[in-house]
């Protein structure tokens, strides 16, 4: 759907070409924007079917436990794709990955991300537990700088407000990202991005 306020130029030309190549219909209308868009500067809306994914046992995972902020989830998807970690496990209760705020914040990365919801971490662990597990916790003793994964691994992050429950300290090797005492903690997308970079920096050039 294209808004009448969309200016002609390279962006519209590129979008038109992509739609033609994919046999996707382009509809010029303003009505749908009044219903669906919460922003005044939105000029394109894409409609797609929700899809399901499967996680690979041979790839590294990022695990989000009870994420509640849609924008954060989308931002993490974007970073994860950039660092070659497009396998995401999401532990309920959690935000809907198809929330428009997630899709927007991911900048399209959601369409290249395999994500699966689980009702508990135990459910995830039963299927994918045969790997190195690294829960990120503020009271952990092991610094991220000292983490050297030797095989397939999962980076585990908690809720934006509460972090991971205490019982995660008994799972795998809990890790902390060192920072100055002038802040209480890093926000979730930044912490996850730093962790993914450190864990994949030796292989990132191969992606």
PLM regions with names:
Residues 23-25, 114, 132, 173:
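Conserved beta-strand segments of alpha/beta enzyme cores
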Residues 135-184:
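Active-site/ligand-binding-proximal alpha/beta "capping" segment
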Residues 31-35, 43-54:
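Short, charged beta->alpha transition segments
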Residues 44-46, 79-83, 95-111, 166-207:
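Structured adenosyl-cofactor binding patch, chiefly the S-adenosyl-L-methionine
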Residues 14-36, 116-119:
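A glycine-rich helix N-cap at a beta->alpha junction
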Residues 36-39, 124-125, 144, 184-190:
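Short, charged, surface-exposed secondary-structure boundary motifs
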Residues 31-33, 93-95, 118, 160-162, ...:
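Short, acidic/turn-prone active-site loops that include or flank metal/cofactor-
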Residues 2-7, 12-16, 47, 51-140:
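RNA substrate-binding interface of SAM-dependent RNA methyltransferases
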């Amino acid at each position: 759907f294209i808004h009448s306020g969309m200016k002609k130029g390279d962006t519209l030309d590129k979008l038109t070409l992509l739609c033609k190549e994919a046999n996707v219909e382009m509809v010029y209308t303003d009505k749908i924007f009044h219903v669906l868009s919460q922003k005044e500067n939105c000029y394109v809306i894409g409609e797609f079917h929700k899809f399901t994914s499967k996680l690979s046992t041979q790839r590294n995972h990022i695990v989000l436990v009870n994420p509640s902020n849609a924008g954060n989830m989308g931002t993490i998807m974007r970073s994860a794709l950039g660092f070659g970690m497009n396998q995401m496990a999401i532990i309920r209760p959690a935000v809907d990955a198809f929330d428009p705020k997630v899709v927007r914040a991911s900048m399209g990365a959601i369409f290249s991300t395999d994500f699966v919801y689980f009702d508990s971490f135990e459910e995830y662990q039963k299927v994918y537990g045969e790997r190195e597990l690294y829960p990120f916790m503020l009271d952990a003793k092991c610094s991220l700088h000292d983490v050297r994964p030797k095989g397939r691994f999962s980076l585990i992050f908690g809720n934006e407000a509460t972090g991971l429950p205490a019982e995660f300290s008994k799972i795998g090797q809990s890790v902390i990202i060192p920072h100055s005492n002038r802040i209480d903690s890093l926000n979730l997308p930044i912490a996850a991005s730093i962790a993914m970079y450190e864990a994949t920096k030796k292989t990132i050039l191969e992606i």
